[in-house]
Amino acid sequence: MERTYVMVKPDGVQRCLVGEIVSRIEKKGLKIAALRMNVMTEAAAKEHYKEHSERPFFGSLVSFVTSGPSVSMVIEGNNAIKIMRAINGATNPVDALPGTIRGDLAVDMGRNVVHASDAPESAEREIGLHFEESEISGYPRADDEWLYE
């Protein structure tokens, strides 16, 4: 079972979109193996987005993700990374298709509601940054036999 990291960013929390986003994830057959709401520290935000540290928007990105509570999740499922990227839609909401989280719920690139890991390596790194292994609960869903061959 593949794991990925997903975060509902502070704009999604403030706009009361957490339930909508969790519902979309679960309806797609993915499992929520861990979930936490907290305000990300500046150190954690800088580590999380370190690949963008030389970009001009880095400071505002760190300020934004530390500006209020966010919801961090570990999501499990077959092809979880690829599926979550598809559910989220394009990073820029203007380019995101209707039916995706960003296409339906986000309006601005800087406030695009949700983050998901883009590769197995980043998923492992991001999960490890935000969760201890003991906090992650793998479990069989009652509908697994109807979802997977």
Swiss-Prot record:
SMART domains: NDK
Active site positions: H115
Subcellular location: Cytoplasm
Keywords linked to the UniProt accession: ATP-binding, Cytoplasm, Kinase, Magnesium, Metal-binding, Nucleotide metabolism, Nucleotide-binding, Phosphoprotein, Transferase
Record has Nucleotide-binding as a keyword: yes
CDD domains per UniProt: NDPk_I
GO biological process, one term: CTP biosynthetic process
Cofactor requirement: Mg(2+)
Residues that bind ATP: K9, F57, R85, T91, R102, N112
Family annotation (SUPFAM superfamilies): Nucleoside diphosphate kinase, NDK
Gene Ontology cellular component annotations, sorted alphabetically: cytoplasm
Reaction catalysis annotation: a 2'-deoxyribonucleoside 5'-diphosphate + ATP = a 2'-deoxyribonucleoside 5'-triphosphate + ADP; a ribonucleoside 5'-diphosphate + ATP = a ribonucleoside 5'-triphosphate + ADP
Record has Phosphoprotein as a keyword: yes
EC numbers for this chain: 2.7.4.6
Class of the enzyme per the UniProt entry, highest EC level: transferase
Any one GO MF annotation of this record: ATP binding
Family: Belongs to the NDK family.
Job of this protein: Major role in the synthesis of nucleoside triphosphates other than ATP. The ATP gamma phosphate is transferred to the NDP beta phosphate via a ping-pong mechanism, using a phosphorylated active-site intermediate.
HAMAP family tied to this protein: NDP_kinase (MF_00451)
UniProt name for this protein: Nucleoside diphosphate kinase
Organism: Methanococcoides burtonii (strain DSM 6242 / NBRC 107633 / OCM 468 / ACE-M)
Gene that specifies this protein: ndk
